[in-house]
């Protein structure tokens, strides 16, 4: 039977198939729906199973990878689930595989883009390769500029407004020339319709752009695609739906008022283009204070009811009357429910306040003027870290609250704090250093709010930012839709936001306080807060009904069902779309079993049937089709009825056990196609070189051991395939152990080069080059054996010497590149399943100055020259150290500590370069036996399995 390279493609189901496709590659999953086929994909299931918290990121990366035909996706993932890092994993893979030429990130404002850039550089598994040299010593503007430059070869960042203006005047040819084969990311895409650009319809310009480009991967990011009504979803989906699936008004899917009329039609149109992920389970630490208020019409929202004082109630009644003529704004009532000045002014009139009025409010009777601010101050005073959200800044809003806090003894944070204190930070649109303040708030030394314990945020922080270790979130102002409130809450309840508390063994708990100010007395106006929450709940129920349709029809519905399915105790809750938590995925008739079973019995039974009958019709086999086709595409070997090696192959709509390759391909390329899931188009120079190496390798090994220069023999050996380099090292170790005297000079040169990869163990000479644990080999004087239990304990103890070091860091040395790296193990032993979470070594000169000083001065305690400040007093040295923003309290405890810190942080001509500090650290690691040889040191693409 002839072999086609298509026999070795990794197959994924197409969204739709025509009659002409039946029995061909495009009909690789006959009789199965797209969703049913995808539900059993091994790679995607493995990603979710191995990492329940972040496996969705690997799932989406695989879904949009070079192996699949899928190129657009609405990433409808709840706020705080790590959408940015999901996108980065897709973009980085596309870059590595050559699938795309670049990545353009579009967002509503510069703040969101800066946050995306920061996440890309520091938090999304990019290994530090985008961190600019000298980052720690730069100012804020220079940091942003250098980070943009570091990623500029692949990433571009534009606001919706500026990008729309740019592409609106470009021809289709110009757009394709510049943006074909790009990863296109649209962050918080639900805002696109509301963005205004002078002289340009922003939505139309970007929609045209998306329909013009070719070969692109398109990702729309949102945690809230609908804000006021379900019909808003159409504008979002139409950006990626093909022309024949576009949702038009005349289709009648949504009514003119935005209600969903045809749920089945909506589900059909979005098939294969939505990924849906809920937030962590409601019982995982997020709780809501208060209760459902009676007499409001609300059924689900738990609110904190606060009764206004008689003084505030009287002012509120006047404010309500002033709003009577404009029932759509209620600005007076809303401002008055926040706070009333002692002279009975509120809102814009409160801007004319004087210090004595503020001091009067800030005293013991704050509740007299603001029942909400009094509640917040009491919460913040007893909580390590608190976040308060308020729509209003001026008038009775956050500006007034800031003045009250200052009068109460709080200090305002700047982001440069070096000493503990009772501080708050104000984050508004006028702030230029929001990210600096947030970074200081999130710093590891502020886990318990020692430097900043209270954040006051306006709408500018409602999206994109993460506030870590917050214990209490206080919502001061509701909104007419609940989406705004949910976004604010998500700032302090996000993926990884409380990991440091978990690491300390503490229970993670965030309490949300949604405040409702209610006027005192019977004949008083209604509470505007209560009215707004009631309206938002009604809207939210309509939106959640549509959200459930998207969840059940999502491409990854079955794959993420374990994450999205909440316990039945939450039936009827908002978290379960106000209905039953249990649900079924559309077009998935049978949920695949656990992964081990998926790959086991069912496929084996089908193969046995094919072996017996000589072939079979997949459509009538009692087996999950995706499982069978996974066997086909993997090229897995079986034994046919005659005892010969064979593979499952699709032929004319049947499955057959066939020879791996035809007799005409027995030669050079037969072995190539037996072992690689590739098509001809994917062959590159690396594959050709690898095949050529198979013929030339024996000669190269012979030359290495006979005529190669001794000075470069190690570098030459390390460039060979891993298994060859390992075999050479094992032969050299055995030759020395057996007392061989032939070719001693070259043998010893190789042994010296690889000295960090072998040692005498309890059972004999042990080699672990390119191998760990049970893969290591042991020479007992007669033969090489797998590592036994004693050897495994020996290797584990050797590894523990590095990972359990008292200073939390150890050195790595690449004997080939002569590079020195440092690995951070301060967080202890990591999860050995999720390799992405492992810390790996980074070149010493790439670490920031603050961390290097911390290691060399405080952990290693390397003293400086004896003649450095020999006569200075402790007081004099403390005064100098306190002027340096890098200093910590421990640097001031003794003359020795102070002198060390001042020595390593000298300024001007005496300033130590990173290279100088690294030389001292390298020497210390060697002297303390904490330097490990590792060939990944100095490489961007590290194999994390080596660090597990």
From Swiss-Prot:
The keyword Hydrolase applies. A motif (DEAH box) lies at residues 187-190. Residues 64-243 form the Helicase ATP-binding domain. GO terms for molecular function: ATP binding; DNA binding; helicase activity; hydrolase activity. Residues 371-554 form the Helicase C-terminal domain. Keywords: ATP-binding, Helicase, Hydrolase, Nucleotide-binding. Its EC number is 3.6.4.-. ATP binds at residues 77-84. This is Putative helicase 009L. It comes from Frog virus 3 (isolate Goorha) (FV-3). The lineage of its organism: Viruses, Varidnaviria, Bamfordvirae, Nucleocytoviricota, Megaviricetes.
């Amino acid at each position: 039977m002839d072999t086609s390279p298509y026999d070795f493609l990794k197959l994924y189901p197409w969204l739709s198939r025509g009659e002409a496709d039946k029995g061909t590659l495009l009909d690789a999953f006959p009789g199965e729906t797209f969703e049913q086929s995808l539900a059993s994909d091994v790679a995607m299931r493995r990603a979710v199973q191995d990492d329940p918290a972040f496996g969705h990121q690997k799932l989406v990366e695989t879904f949009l990878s070079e192996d699949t035909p899928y190129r657009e996706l609405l990433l409808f993932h709840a706020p705080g689930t790590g959408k940015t890092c999901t996108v980065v994993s897709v973009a980085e893979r596309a870059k590595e595989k050559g699938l795309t030429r670049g990545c353009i990130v579009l967002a509503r404002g510069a703040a969101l883009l800066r946050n995306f850039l920061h996440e890309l550089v520091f938090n999304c598994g990019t290994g530090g390769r985008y961190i600019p040299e000298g980052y720690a010593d730069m100012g804020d503007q220079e940091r942003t500029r250098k980070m943009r430059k570091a990623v500029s070869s692949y990433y571009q960042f534009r606001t919706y407004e500026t990008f729309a203006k740019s592409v609106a005047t470009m021809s289709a040819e110009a757009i394709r020339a510049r943006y074909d084969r790009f990863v296109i990311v649209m962050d918080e895409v639900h805002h696109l319709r509301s963005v205004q650009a002078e002289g340009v319809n922003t939505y139309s310009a970007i929609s045209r752009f998306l329909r013009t480009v070719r070969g692109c991967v398109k990702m729309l990011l949102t945690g809230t695609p609908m804000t006021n009504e379900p019909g808003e979803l159409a504008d979002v989906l139409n950006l990626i739906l093909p022309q024949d699936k576009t949702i038009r008004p005349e289709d009648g899917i949504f009514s003119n008022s935005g209600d969903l009329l045809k749920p089945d039609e909506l589900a059909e149109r979005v098939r294969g283009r939505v990924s849906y992920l809920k937030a962590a389970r409601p019982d995982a630490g997020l709780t809501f204070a208060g209760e459902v208020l009676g007499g409001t019409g609300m059924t689900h929202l738990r609110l904190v009811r606060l009764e206004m004082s008689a003084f505030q109630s009287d002012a509120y009644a006047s404010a309500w009357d002033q709003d009577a003529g404009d029932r759509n704004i209620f600005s007076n009532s809303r401002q008055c429910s926040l706070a009333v000045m002692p002279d009975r002014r509120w809102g814009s009139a409160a801007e004319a306040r004087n210090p004595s009025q503020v001091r009067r409010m800030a005293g013991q009777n704050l509740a007299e003027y603001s029942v909400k601010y009094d509640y917040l101050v009491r919460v913040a005073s007893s909580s390590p870290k608190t976040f308060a959200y308020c729509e209003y800044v001026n008038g009775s809003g956050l500006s007034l609250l800031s003045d009250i806090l200052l009068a109460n003894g709080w200090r305002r944070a700047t982001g440069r704090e070096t000493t503990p204190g009772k501080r708050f930070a104000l984050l508004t649109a006028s702030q230029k250093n929001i990210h600096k303040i947030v970074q200081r708030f999130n710093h590891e030394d502020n886990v318990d709010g020692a430097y900043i314990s209270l954040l006051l945020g306006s709408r500018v922080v409602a999206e994109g930012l993460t506030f870590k270790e917050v214990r209490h979130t206080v919502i001061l102002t509701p909104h007419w839709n609940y989406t705004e409130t949910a976004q604010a809450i998500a700032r302090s309840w996000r993926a990884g936001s409380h990991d440091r508390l978990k690491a300390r063994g503490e229970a993670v708990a965030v309490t949300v306080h949604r405040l409702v100010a209610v006027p005192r007395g019977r004949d008083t106006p209604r509470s505007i807060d209560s009215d707004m929450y009631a309206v938002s709940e009604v809207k939210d129920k309509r939106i959640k009904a549509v959200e459930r349709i998207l969840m059940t029809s999502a491409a990854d519905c079955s794959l993420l069902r374990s994450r999205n399915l909440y316990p039945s105790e939450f039936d009827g809750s908002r978290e379960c779309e106000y209905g039953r938590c249990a649900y079924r995925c559309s077009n998935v008739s049978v949920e695949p079993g656990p992964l081990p079973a998926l790959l086991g019995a069912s496929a084996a039974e089908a193969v046995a049937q094919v072996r017996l009958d000589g072939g079979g019709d997949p459509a009538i086999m009692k087996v999950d089709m995706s499982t069978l086709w996974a066997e086909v595409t993997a090229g897995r070997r079986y034994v046919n009825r005659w005892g010969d090696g064979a593979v499952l192959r699709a032929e004319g709509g049947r499955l057959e056990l066939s020879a791996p390759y035809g007799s005409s391909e027995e030669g050079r390329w037969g072995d190539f196609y037996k072992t690689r899931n590739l098509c001809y188009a994917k062959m590159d120079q690396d594959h050709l070189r690898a095949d050529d190496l198979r013929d030339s390798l024996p000669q190269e090994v012979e030359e290495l051991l006979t005529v190669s220069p001794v000075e470069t023999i190690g570098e030459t050996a390390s460039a060979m395939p891993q298994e060859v380099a390992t075999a050479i090292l094992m032969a050299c170790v055995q030759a020395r152990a057996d007392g061989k005297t032939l070719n001693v000079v070259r043998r010893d040169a190789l042994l010296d080069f690889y000295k960090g990869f072998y040692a005498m163990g309890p059972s004999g000479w042990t080699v672990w080059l390119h191998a760990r644990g049970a893969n290591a080999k042991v020479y007992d004087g007669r033969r090489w054996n797998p590592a036994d239990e004693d050897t495994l304990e020996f290797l584990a103890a050797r590894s523990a010497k590095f990972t359990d070091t008292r200073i939390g860091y150890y050195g790595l040395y690449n004997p080939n590149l002569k590079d020195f790296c440092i690995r951070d193990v301060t967080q202890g032993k990591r999860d050995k399943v999720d390799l992405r979470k492992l810390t790996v070594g980074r070149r010493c000169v790439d670490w920031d100055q603050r961390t290097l000083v911390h290691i060399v001065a405080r952990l290693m305690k390397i003293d400086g020259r004896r003649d450095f400040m020999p006569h200075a007093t402790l007081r004099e040295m403390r005064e100098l150290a306190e002027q340096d923003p890098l200093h910590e309290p421990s640097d001031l405890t003794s003359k020795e500590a102070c002198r060390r810190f001042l020595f390593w942080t000298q300024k001007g001509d005496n300033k130590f370069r990173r290279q100088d500090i690294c030389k001292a650290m390298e020497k210390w690691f060697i002297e303390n036996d904490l330097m490990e040889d590792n060939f990944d040191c100095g490489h961007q693409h590290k194999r994390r399995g080596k660090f597990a």
